[in-house]
Amino acid sequence: MKKVLFLINPASGKLVGQNLKDCIISELDGVLDSGLYDIEYSARDIETQYDNYLSNYEIVVVAGGDGTISQIVNVIAGLERKPKLGIIPIGTGNDLANSIGILHLYKSQGLGALLKIILECKIVKIDILSLDNKFIFSNYLGIGSDAKISSDFDRLRHRPVFREIRSCISNKGFYGLLTLKNIFYRIPFDVEIRDENEHSATEITSLNSGIREIVITNTKIYAGMELSSKCRMDDGKFEVTVIRSMWEWIHLLFAILRRRPLDTITRNLMQFQTNRLELNFTGDTFCQIDGEKYDRPCRGEKRLLVNVITSCEVIIP
């Protein structure tokens, strides 16, 4: 069994992944024998590319953003022998890496220091969630305005005009423009929420049409901000936050600027923890999982079920 597989998304960030392979080889020279690791570029369909293959390694290091990591977590969740997960955060969204301290280490100390930490292999367990037992994720699920932004980004990023814009501004800058474009988007139907409380009783909440978004999070950081001061990634629970008004949506910006969790600055915020959530609605809206669009779960008459299904080991500083 080999020790490490480095899996690089060549399209991550501003194509940083295309040059990363040589940097990894250089940093590992004299540190780890070349026969103990492999470096590969990921295909778009990672789940098919690496199904039942990752168990051949002790550690799988993903160089990419939250979307790439989510695809690998999807594979790891189904394995009997799960490798440890390492992260080189080079994506547009790096919320998981930010939540566990890897992003700060990478930005402040560089690739060499990060590879050393990965080889030391200090780990923490994080919960893995599923949507309808079909879509597996570790970070967050968004329904509404944030998913509309992700959908627009995915639709536009493959067009030639996007390459022109990308040469002038960063992906995050482009996300900012799309945020302004979708500032008035609302979920156009009523939503019923059923969740299991700490006493294993079912609570039912009805939300009228016109709310901005529903965000289900397992990570401490979501879109660069903290939503909940109570978040733990290994407690078998996840946080549910409902952004009902424009004012609460503006508070998301305050949370970023003030570097404080949203629940500490927004009065009467609808937020709770659970290990099982059911959403019932009839209508069409947008859905994103770990920053990637998933429109299919949010069309027509729907009953969506979110629950914790397993966990995986992630390397931390």
Where are these regions (language model features)?
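ATP/NTP phosphate-donor binding region
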Residues: 1-63, 70, 74-77, 111-116
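ATP/nucleoside-binding phosphotransfer catalytic cores, i.e., glycine-rich phosphate-binding loops
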Residues: 201-208, 227-317
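Histidine- and/or cysteine-centered catalytic micro-motif in compact active-site loops
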Residues: 196, 216-221, 243-247
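Short N-terminal binding/cap micro-motifs at the start of the first secondary-structure element
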Residues: 13-17, 222-224, 313
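Short amphipathic alpha-helical segments
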Residues: 18-20, 73-76, 98-100, 227-228, ...
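Glycine-rich phosphate/pyrophosphate-binding beta-alpha loops
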Residues: 142, 146, 215-228
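Short glycine-rich anion-binding loops that position phosphate/pyrophosphate groups of nucleotides
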Residues: 65-68, 90-93, 143-144, 219-221
